Curated annotation (Swiss-Prot):
Top-level enzyme category: oxidoreductase
Keywords: Antioxidant, Copper, Cytoplasm, Disulfide bond, Metal-binding, Oxidoreductase, Zinc
Catalytic activity: 2 superoxide + 2 H(+) = H2O2 + O2
Principal place of residence: cytoplasm
GO cellular component, one term: cytoplasm
Native organism: Drosophila teissieri (Fruit fly)
Protein name per UniProt: Superoxide dismutase [Cu-Zn]
EC number, UniProt record: 1.15.1.1
One Pfam family in the UniProt entry: Sod_Cu
Disulfide bonds: C56-C145
PROSITE patterns per record: SOD_CU_ZN_1 (PS00087), SOD_CU_ZN_2 (PS00332)
Length: 153
């Protein structure tokens, strides 16, 4: 059974991101567009809570149900919500195209109901040596976010 979800991002960065997964055994395809980004890399993460009552700050930390350190999408030791970076050219829109085999739209670890956050700076993928590298990727301010909701198939 295919599951689809959508996230409308608001803030200084704005856009729409779609999620699609064919089954619980297949990767999630993430696609969409974001505007309002400066040229360069921007951290792109799923955060724990679907709470945006205090803007992006109330979405909590990266979604990390297994208590791992921050890492790159290809790392075994990473938060489930660590989706790496999206690259902006400085022109609108910035395209989002990610395929990830760790996140899911099924079961207890589903990202549906959680928040996507776009950050001001590049995610150093846990390798930067900064005090925040192993927790946030030192990706800077939260400049856009939205709750992931289930979408019509």
């Amino acid at each position: 059974m295919v599951v689809k979800a959508v996230c409308v991002i608001n803030g200084d960065a704005k856009g729409t991101v779609f999620f699609e997964q064919e089954s619980s055994e297949t990767p999630v395809k993430v696609s969409g567009e974001v505007c309002g980004l400066a040229k360069g890399l921007h951290g792109f993460h799923v955060h724990e809570f679907g709470d945006n009552t205090n803007g992006c700050m109330s979405s909590g930390p990266h979604f990390n149900p297994y208590g791992k350190e921050h890492g790159a999408p290809v790392d075994e030791n990473r938060h489930l919500g660590d989706l790496g970076n999206i690259e902006a050219t400085g022109d609108c829109p910035t395209k989002v195209s990610i395929t990830d085999s760790k996140i899911t739209l099924f079961g207890a670890d589903s990202i549906i109901g959680r928040t996507v956050v776009v950050h001001a700076d590049a995610d150093d993928l846990g390798q930067g040596g900064h005090e925040l590298s192993k927790s946030t990727g030192n990706a800077g301010a939260r400049i856009g976010c939205g709750v992931i909701g289930i979408a019509k198939v």
